[in-house]
Amino acid sequence: MVCCFGKKDERTKTIEKELHKERKIMRRQINLLLLGSGESGKSTFVKQMHIIHGAGEFTADEVRAYRQQIYQNAISAMRVLLDARNKLGIAWEDPKRQVEVEKVMRFSVGDLLKGIDFTTFVEVAPIISDFWNDAAIRKTYEQRNLFQISDSCQYFFEHIPRIAMPDFYPTNRDILFCRKATRGISEHIFEINKIPFRFIDVGGQRSQRQKWFQCFTDITSILFMVASNEYDQVILEDRRTNRVVESRSVFETIVNNRAFSNVSIILFMNKNDLLQEKVPKSDIRQYFTDFTGDHTLVRDVQFFLVDKFEASRRDRARPFFYHFTTAVDTENIRRVFRDVRESILEQNLKTLMMQ
């Protein structure tokens, strides 16, 4: 019996030791919640963390899955453009293109969700290239703020010959441009300088936001992503609400929530590359009548948008941090997150000292 108790005591001590070790790790762990409207770049940011602070490369299984998703992205985006061209009444540069339309439009949403294999994709790849090179599709694409289409489609259309090769193996850059809506909650842990950083990525569509409240405990910081180039676009859910207005409304709810009174909230004004392309072509004054700067200057537009979000904060004493980012640019994210990481660790140390 004594021997039995001895073994039991040893097991208890081992369990307690493991629990103590686990609690120590949990106290050091930085929990970052990624929030923002759909298509703001949250999942792309997580991919960058994998590249910069994780394995650096994706596994063979992950790459195979991304390859199928890239095929799906290209077909899906061209279906959207073909439908929009028809609705906008834009005539084909080459009338013969019309006979090819059904070869792309035949794919149903169900087909795309099931996945597109190489054999299927290679049949339509030349047709997609021909469509993309037709002036009618280019004119339609120039009016993309009028309909819902992925920002990454141009990248894939321009790389169709490479993507359609039998030995196509997606690069990290291809994977960064690949789009798949986040459903539910996904968690990713990366050890950075011996400190575990836990990233919680939550779907940004309206239907997914009720799940945000499941993630609100033990949060160190919130990284709130905004697609800054979307000032002339409307959301998918109602096709009326301006996307930046929607993002600001969500940000206002989060930044003024009492649950986050001790949580640092960092604003990422993302898709800066696309904003720079858009500003000379799309006058922000048509969508925000209170804009008073030079509508042709990217910097004026950037700070107008930042001010919109900054003004929604009720607690003016709280520090306000923001960064202009391009989530598909690895060096930009490496540099920005280095700065963000230091400010988060500093704030976390202050919080621990107060406990």
From Swiss-Prot:
GO terms for cellular component: brush border membrane; cytoplasm; heterotrimeric G-protein complex; nucleus. Residues 28-355 form the G-alpha domain. PROSITE patterns: G_ALPHA (PS51882). GO terms for biological process: adenylate cyclase-modulating G protein-coupled receptor signaling pathway; antifungal innate immune response; defense response to fungus; positive regulation of gene expression; Rho protein signal transduction. Disruption phenotype: Up-regulation of nlp-29 is severely impaired in the hyp7 epidermal cell but not in vulva epidermal cells following fungal infection by D.coniospora or physical injury. Changing Q205L: Probably constitutively active. Constitutive expression of nlp-29, nlp-31, nlp-34, cnc-2, cnc-4 and cnc-1 in absence of infection. Keywords: GTP-binding, Magnesium, Metal-binding, Nucleotide-binding, Transducer. The keyword GTP-binding applies. Residues 174-182 are annotated as: G2 motif. GO terms for molecular function: D5 dopamine receptor binding; G-protein beta/gamma-subunit complex binding; GTP binding; GTPase activity; metal ion binding. Pfam families: G-alpha (PF00503). PANTHER family: GTP-BINDING PROTEIN ALPHA SUBUNIT, GUANINE NUCLEOTIDE-BINDING PROTEIN SUBUNIT ALPHA HOMOLOG. Belongs to the G-alpha family. This is Guanine nucleotide-binding protein alpha-12 subunit. The lineage of its organism: Eukaryota, Metazoa, Ecdysozoa, Nematoda, Chromadorea.
